């Protein structure tokens, strides 16, 4: 008897009803509104979807396995390629997990923590502006796309001025940050923060009460609270279903317990409610950054943790002190050796809970590296979310989930 091929894609074993009234349609993986390499197999009765099966894997790069074959510092730039719209969030989540594994989280200098938080919240604004621009364009609002990219460009210029990269930042290091803020950077940041609230009002003026926008989003993609919990939704996908949960509040990291901000929640449970949350979250990020600016000015100019067994010394010390040079050589050529143990660290990325699980056996590279990416779960929910809707609503629903395939196909 012929043995079944275990690598056979599971969707080929799905049974679709074939009759004169139903048809099976492929949505993607080259569809411009698929937000990456998403393929949906849709069974349709006329224009109405009766069954939906997401098919992923078109961007798979073996990222977790790559992480298990690299020393810890080598893998950090690779995390940029997950959610490439918010690269700093990936860098930071991995760095924080390694720091907690090493036991040096509390040794990270306060200035480094402030800089990290500014970059994280600026990255959140960039990600939300990109979401709003592309989502509005998918639904047909061309002008909003242009306005959002204008403000996003200014924020990306700020990031570029700090780390030299526009998209894949690598702006965080295990143990701190590589650079202090450039001279005049905070002044330019203040100009941006003063201008952005008026621009958010402009976007809302174009969309919030727009009749077509509301018709396309209201009562579309409804996620009841129970469904959100069953599918492990997080971020705005969870808060948009009336569940108040934000890791920055529930399990504070860095200095989030020292800043004052609100958690926007909506009980609408639909795409329109999630849109309202994205707008409010940008305002909360502005509020957080405004509190961080005076905190930065009060800190000492130290950027990296002092942990010689894991973290290289300052460049000046490496060039002038024999011991620092030898330690640096060992760390670069062989890598740090964390103690035996395991850790899972969740963070609140712009799209939801981004967490890293690391299992160490005392070697310079992880024994096991597992990435918990929010977009993976938010893609899975489509099979329950799409049936009952019409084909025209598919683009709206995919847009409201805010998925990116760099972190789905790892």
Curated annotation (Swiss-Prot):
Pfam families: Complex1_49kDa. Disulfide bonds: none annotated. Gene3D superfamilies: Cytochrome-c3 Hydrogenase, chain B (1.10.645.10). The keyword Transport applies. Its EC number is 7.1.1.-. It catalyses: a quinone + NADH + 5 H(+)(in) = a quinol + NAD(+) + 4 H(+)(out). One of its GO terms (molecular function) is quinone binding. It is found in: Cell inner membrane. GO terms for cellular component: plasma membrane. The keyword NAD applies. Keywords: Cell inner membrane, Cell membrane, Membrane, NAD, Quinone, Translocase, Transport, Ubiquinone. It is a peripheral membrane protein. InterPro entries: NADH_Q_OxRdtase_suD (IPR001135), NDH1_su_D/H (IPR022885), NiFe-Hase_large (IPR029014). It comes from the Bacteria. It is an enzyme of class 7 (translocase). HAMAP family: NDH1_NuoD. NDH-1 shuttles electrons from NADH, via FMN and iron-sulfur (Fe-S) centers, to quinones in the respiratory chain. The immediate electron acceptor for the enzyme in this species is believed to be ubiquinone. Couples the redox reaction to proton translocation (for every two electrons transferred, four hydrogen ions are translocated across the cytoplasmic membrane), and thus conserves the redox energy in a proton gradient. NDH-1 is composed of 14 different subunits. Subunits NuoB, C, D, E, F, and G constitute the peripheral sector of the complex. Belongs to the complex I 49 kDa subunit family. This is NADH-quinone oxidoreductase subunit D. It comes from Nitratiruptor sp. (strain SB155-2). The lineage of its organism: Bacteria, Pseudomonadati, Campylobacterota, Epsilonproteobacteria, Nautiliales. The gene is nuoD.
């Amino acid at each position: 008897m012929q043995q079944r091929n275990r690598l056979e894609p599971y969707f080929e074993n799905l049974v679709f009803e074939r009759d004169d009234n139903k048809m099976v349609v492929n949505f993607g993986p080259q569809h411009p509104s698929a937000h990456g390499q998403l393929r949906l197999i849709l069974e349709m009765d006329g224009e109405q979807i009766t069954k939906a099966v997401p098919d992923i894997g078109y961007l798979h790069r073996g990222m977790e396995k790559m992480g298990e074959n690299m020393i810890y510092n080598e893998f950090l730039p690779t995390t940029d390629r997950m959610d490439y719209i918010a690269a700093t969030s990936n860098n930071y989540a991995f760095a924080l997990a390694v720091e907690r594994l090493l036991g040096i989280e509390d040794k990270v200098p306060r200035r480094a923590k402030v800089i990290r938080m500014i970059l994280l919240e600026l990255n959140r604004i960039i990600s939300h502006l990109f979401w709003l621009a592309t989502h509005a364009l998918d639904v047909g609002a061309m002008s909003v796309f242009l306005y959002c990219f204008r403000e996003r460009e200014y924020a990306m210029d700020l990031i570029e001025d700090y780390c030299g990269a526009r998209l894949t930042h690598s702006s965080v290091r295990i143990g701190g940050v590589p650079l202090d803020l450039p001279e005049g950077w905070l002044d330019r940041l203040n100009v941006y923060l003063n201008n952005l609230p008026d621009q958010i009002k402009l976007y809302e003026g174009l969309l919030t009460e727009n009749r077509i926008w509301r018709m396309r989003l209201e009562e579309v993609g409804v996620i009841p609270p129970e469904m959100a919990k069953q599918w492990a939704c997080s971020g705005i996908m969870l808060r948009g279903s009336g569940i108040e949960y934000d890791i920055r509040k529930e399990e504070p990291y860095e200095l989030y317990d020292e800043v004052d901000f609100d958690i926007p929640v909506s009980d609408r449970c639909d795409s329109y409610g999630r849109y309202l949350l994205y707008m409010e979250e940008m305002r909360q990020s502005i509020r957080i950054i405004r509190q961080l600016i005076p905190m930065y000015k009060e800190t000492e100019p130290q950027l990296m943790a002092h942990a010689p067994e894991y973290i290289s010394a300052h460049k000046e010390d490496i060039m002038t002190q024999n011991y620092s040079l030898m330690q640096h050589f060992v760390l670069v050529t062989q890598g740090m050796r964390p103690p035996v143990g395991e850790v899972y660290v969740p963070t609140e990325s712009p799209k939801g809970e981004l967490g890293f699980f690391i299992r160490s056996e005392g070697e310079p590279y992880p024994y096991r590296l597992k990435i918990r990416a929010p977009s993976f779960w938010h893609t899975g929910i489509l099979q329950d979310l799409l049936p009952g809707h019409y084909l025209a609503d598919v683009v709206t629903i995919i847009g409201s989930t805010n998925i990116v395939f760099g972190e789905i196909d790892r």
